């Protein structure tokens, strides 16, 4: 990181289930390593949740927040029938914003969350 100019780093930690202690420890180690190389890093820690997950998403988000200190949520798969209602509880209980929504499979389908547009789409 120090030898090149980097503005963003995205880490895909697929399979890091909140119930797998060893995998959660690995992701915490990644975070500690980043902080050693760049003071203050990571600057954002987003949890990407599948809108179809349901009530399990709340316990999942709590565990990731306890481990990493979440700064926001990205909610995907809103192009289907899922409404993602659990995200309201998650954002409220963890005091983190919903920052992005996924409404398809393309890059352009990851959008900055717009609360008014989100509510309008519910009806």
List where the protein language model places each region.
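P-loop/Walker A NTP-binding module and the surrounding RecA-like catalytic core of P-loop NTPases
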Residues: 1-123
